[in-house]
């Protein structure tokens, strides 16, 4: 079965529309205008892998508007409503890419760190890398993205705690970075933007990490060091698994009663290959949506670790892989108009007070005395970074994709373009470019054409688990100011 070779969507000029910003209400993400809860249908987006972040050559995943337009169109057709971007340069202009994803109805979750020296916490010696120069760069990331309405939130760390050994020293520093980021946002942004942590799904430290970051020191519910959201990179569902065999039932039981939104910041085991993505119906089904707020598929662009949905070539052309079609077909099995139309609960959640008894694993840090703000950093928190990056939504004159894109059978797609959605509408799986008002049901496809059906290609092998190489690499810090 071959994919249809035409995608029809509006490609002309349009005035900038904006998705509604999301807020955290208890354990849910909530649309600030409709009051509906929001489920993340996400995609990890790091074009070029680690090489895609190259400050010396003015390059990062959100700096090329034509590439963003190409990828936004393909992800919009897939049904993605959120992208996660790992490594960004605050000195580059991201207006065009942010505006394109905004028009396509997609939010952005931004990691404030990068693999370069001085741009992340060193998990081996976090006290050496927590200083004003490091914080200055994280604040600059906030400045660069705070004004985009589709900025969903920031991750203060990614898999910095991956063992009991790192759990002994790292947690207070991640919590301190969270505190500093939230105070900076409070002083310099016009809305509260969630800050959270993306954890490795290492069961020895997962529960303790969650409890360490979600609790309130001295019972103060306004504690600025408390995470606004908690996410995990999990690859425990492989192939034709089940809710029980994958251990998803254990995760639901673990996070039952969470006081902050919990979601998968990465998922998508890559064996068998091609992938089958049978976890989609569970993640967005009744067994999980009361506890989890969706998840982020790892990942859009094919890299050496073989998790991609699309081969993105150096000349700008794209070859879609079988996994793209499979994921699209799995999304079609979910009634997202119902999933996204649930009114957020108004029940007050219980926020645990930080106590040593919350920590179960012997050797994991159970001290909630945090490092003081490092010398020179408080002045930046109070007065802002300088020079100050400024981001804004801009009008896009043409949403037409100019790069050649081929499906998994080698057919060239024609008429590919981003379809700008109406104001306050986010994307949803379904017809190409159709959207939902973050919980108010499916919108109509103004072009009148249905999204293509992409046929999976090739046989499936026996399921097995494989964990990808960690996305966040942590190096000994050096001093770097923007």
Predicted regions and their residues:
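Active-site-adjacent substrate/metal-binding segments within catalytic domains
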Residues: 20-104
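Aromatic-lined substrate-binding rim segments of carbohydrate-active enzymes
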Residues: 65-119, 171-196
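Active-site groove signature of glycoside hydrolases
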Residues: 138-169, 196
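Substrate-binding cleft of secreted/luminal carbohydrate-active enzymes
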Residues: 272-353, 357-367, 371-376, 380, ...
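N-terminal signal peptide
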Residues: 2-3, 8-24, 28, 450, ...
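Noncatalytic carbohydrate-binding groove/subsite architecture in carbohydrate-active enzymes
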Residues: 166-285
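Short, acidic/polar
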Residues: 55-75, 134-142, 205-223, 276-283
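Cleavable C-terminal sorting propeptides in eukaryotic secreted/cell-surface proteins
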Residues: 449-482
